Amino acid sequence: MSKPTLCVIVPVYKAAATLDRCVASVLAQQVAGGLHCILVDDGSPDESGGLCDAWAARDPRVTVLHQENRGVSAARNAGLAAADSEYLVFLDADDALRPGALQAALDAQNTAPQSFVLWHYTTDEQDAAAVTSDIATRPQNTLARLWLDCLLAMPWNKLYRTAAAQQLAFDRQYTLGEDLQFVLDYIDLLGRTAPDFAYTILTAPLTFYDCSREGTLSTKYHADYCKIWPEHFARLNKACYAAHCPQEDMRPLHRAELTVYAEGVADILRRDPAKRRAVRRDKADAALRSPWLHALLERMRIEGCYSAYYLPCRWRSIRLVWVMAEARRTGSPLFGKLDWAGYYLLGRRLRRD
């Protein structure tokens, strides 16, 4: 097979129910210069590996790599090493590409050769929005805004130059949020090779994202959640300050960081496997005493940035963090009442914007 323009890397693990939809969406793409699909079977215990082989048997554009179960980062790294194209895209086995997605991404790249191309996604499989070539260009100092717009943290809504991406790797030490580190590594590399690059964003949703997957905070408990996310946020903040992101973006970023962390603390109380309640409370209390959290709260105070979780975390009130997180999770109006109560208790000195 001659060298294709674009390669799609799909890590596969227990994906028998969705793999056919995923691969069919890739192979249906019309790409000038051709495409290659690499399926990496990460030691899946179900019939996923056989399904991968069946696709390779009937379509020469499909290559299958089988490996022992080592996690999604190792699977992506294996696919990355095998990629033989000018550009590449990552796709998860329970997601799908919308018709025309890959050529739209390539067209955007050709329009702005020095840019980093990203696109929106949809969680509605029946979304009828047309795939168009409409783009928005953003400068490098909108990095924090990309996070706030839910465009930054994932690897599968971006077009990568294969030669550049192959200089990097997904960090296997992380069990959560490792995608963000890879994306930031790529942006850092791009900034060194093309200092004047910009972000080119396709406004149409090109990927269907199945948000019912396991692994999010809402579906899976991570014992090291309150350790991992501060590390990711420290890296993100460093990149944002280096990009000179404006305060009007940094304030909501810090607010979002506090929300992620506080709700991780509440999740310790709700789902930590420790049988004794006192043990769970001790873990939550330790998380609320984190130096990273103290530094974040102090930064927010200096910036004048309010969050509903600001006072509960400042007071290290396990009970109040729990009540607010549960109210937000269940959609209770109590969350809004406590949010505004904290705002007025602070004399409206901190900003809500």
What are these regions (language model features)?
Residues S25, D41-G50:
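A conserved acidic beta->alpha catalytic loop
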Residues R98-Y174:
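Flexible acidic/His/Gly-enriched loops in nucleotide-sugar-dependent glycosyltransferase catalytic domains
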Residues L143-A223:
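Conserved nucleotide-sugar donor-binding catalytic segment
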